């Protein structure tokens, strides 16, 4: 992993994801972790997209179909379910049921989920831009 190839956003995503999944083993948040880990259901389509590039199938019908599956799964699990599950967890963290949790723990999850959700939207628009470039013909002047 390097800043040069992956970028700071990818490294932040990895660190927050890893630490968030490690720290989630508290009785209060164990059920909520599954809703967040569902974000990764879009990852196989991203990996297939990368593989098709490496196999020289960039811009092929197969890659287009995979790209549509990637976008659909991404919107569904990261932008709809992900935001909903994040809201549920943050609401629970700040409810009376979580009064015994330390403030740093609450802040870590609240801010971490905000950052991860923001990254999901940033990456979605980057994917749209990349797919537009790849699958729509360039306008001739």
Task: Specify the residue positions occupied by each region the protein language model found.
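Short acidic alpha-helical/loop segments enriched in Asp/Glu that coordinate divalent cations
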Residues: 32-33, 51-55
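Short, amphipathic, aromatic/basic-enriched membrane-interface segments that mark the entry/exit
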Residues: 1-10
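Short hydrophobic "helix-edge" motifs at membrane interfaces and signal-peptide entry regions
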Residues: 3-4, 29-30, 67-69
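Hydrophobic alpha-helical cores of multi-pass transmembrane domains in eukaryotic membrane proteins
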Residues: 11-22, 34-48, 68-83, 111-118
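Short hydrophobic/aromatic segments of transmembrane alpha-helices and their interfaces
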Residues: 1, 14-15, 26-27, 63-65, ...
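Membrane-helix interface segments
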Residues: 7, 28-29, 61, 103
């Amino acid at each position: 992993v390097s800043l040069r190839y992956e970028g700071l956003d990818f490294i932040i995503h990895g660190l927050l994801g890893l630490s968030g999944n490690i720290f989630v083993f508290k009785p209060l948040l164990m059920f909520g972790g599954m809703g967040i880990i569902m974000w990764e259901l879009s990852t196989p389509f991203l990996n297939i997209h990368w593989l098709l590039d490496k196999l020289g199938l960039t811009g092929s019908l197969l890659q287009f179909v995979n790209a549509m599956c990637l976008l659909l799964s991404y919107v569904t699990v990261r932008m709809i379910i992900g935001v909903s599950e994040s809201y549920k967890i943050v609401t629970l963290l700040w409810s009376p049921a979580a009064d015994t949790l330390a403030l740093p723990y609450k802040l870590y999850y609240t801010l971490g989920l905000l950052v991860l959700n923001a990254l999901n939207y940033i990456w979605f628009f980057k994917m749209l831009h990349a797919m537009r470039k790849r699958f729509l013909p360039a306008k001739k002047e």
